[in-house]
Design a protein with these regions (language model features):
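Structured alpha-helical segments in the cores of large, soluble enzyme domains
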Residues: 12-18, 269-273
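Short coil-to-beta-strand
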Residues: 21-25
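Periplasmic plug
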Residues: 26-28, 63
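Short strand-turn segments of transmembrane beta-barrel domains in outer membranes
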Residues: 1-15, 28-41
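Surface-exposed loop/interface segments of Gram-negative outer-membrane beta-barrel transport/assembly proteins
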Residues: 1, 36-41, 47, 51-139, ...
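Residue-level signature of outer-membrane beta-barrel architecture
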Residues: 18-20, 31, 54, 144-146, ...
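P-loop NTPase catalytic cores that bind/hydrolyze ATP
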Residues: 140, 146, 150-154, 158-159
Length: 273
């Protein structure tokens, strides 16, 4: 059934380190592939990391670090947005008391339709609440240090982050969103939500540091002067689209691939700054 699939998890790791007196480097790669026991749910992630430390001369240093991750998630679970039905409190006892009928549990409810009671095949419910998400994250940081003269050091640092997220949601015929859509013309039809988010961040820091230990010849006192500035630039663009009214035969893969066959019901475009 829903949680009856045989799951497995694969992990692969690779690490390489080395260097000399003036240069040190390290590289690592990690991969995880998780097939969950819940039908339709999977998780996959790849991580890359590179680190480099060098000393080109007696008074200079260069540091560099790069990281990249790619994460893919599949499956939204058999979740419903909200709603309370007279079956909710008794379904948890279905295994213990299987003789209790699920239709028409009390005289106040005269409906004998499982859809009115929010009772669906769990495998169908999982397929009708599907999701496919991919996140990519790239980070790069570097630093340059220069000892201009004894006790006087200049250092500049920079960092760059780039993040993307693409989230596709599908709500099938048994989902709360499809059954209770406000516009009755599109109710009881599959719908999808597409969320695309892109963020960029750049940081730069410049500092100069002077140690007055040669002027203050006292081991009990320390005086340093640090001057510098930092600026950060951040940009973001997020676009969300909801498309409704797909043919009832469309599953998640078909609706995502043929999004033009639906009707656009809402669009959100967010820019910062």
């Amino acid at each position: 059934m829903t949680y009856g699939r045989i799951g497995h998890t694969y992990n692969h790791n690779l690490s390489i380190t080395g260097g000399t007196e003036n240069i040190k480097y390290s590289f690592s790669y990690a991969h995880i592939n998780d097939k969950a026991i819940m039908i339709g749910s999977n998780f996959k992630r790849d991580n890359f990391s590179l680190k480099l430390n060098t000393k080109p001369s007696k008074r200079t240093t260069i540091d560099l670090q790069v990281r990249f991750s790619d994460t893919k998630v599949r499956g939204g679970g058999a979740n419903d947005a909200k709603g309370s039905y007279n079956t909710d409190k008794r379904l948890k006892d279905a295994v213990i008391y299987p003789v209790i009928p699920l239709k028409g549990l009390d005289e106040a409810n005269t409906s004998f339709d499982d859809s009115d009671m929010n009772i669906f095949d769990p495998i169908t419910s999982a397929a009708d609440n599907d999701e496919k998400k991919q996140n990519k994250n790239f980070n790069m940081a570097g630093a340059f240090g220069w000892e201009i003269m004894k006790n006087l050091t200049l250092k500049t640092e920079f960092g760059y982050d780039y993040y993307t997220m693409y989230d596709q949601r599908y709500y099938g015929l048994t989902s709360y969103q499809a059954r209770n859509y406000a516009d009755q013309a599109f109710a009881d039809h599959p719908l999808i939500s597409l969320d695309n988010d892109v963020r960029e961040r750049f940081r730069n820091t410049n500092t100069i540091n002077y140690d007055f230990k040669n002027l203050i010849k006292n081991k009990d006192h320390i005086l340093n002067m640090l001057l510098g500035h930092e600026y950060i630039i951040t940009k973001e663009h997020e676009n969300i689209n909801q498309i409704v009214g797909f043919p009832k035969t469309y599953d998640a893969a078909t609706a995502w691939r043929l999004s033009s066959q639906g009707t656009a019901s809402g669009t959100s475009d967010f820019y910062s700054p």
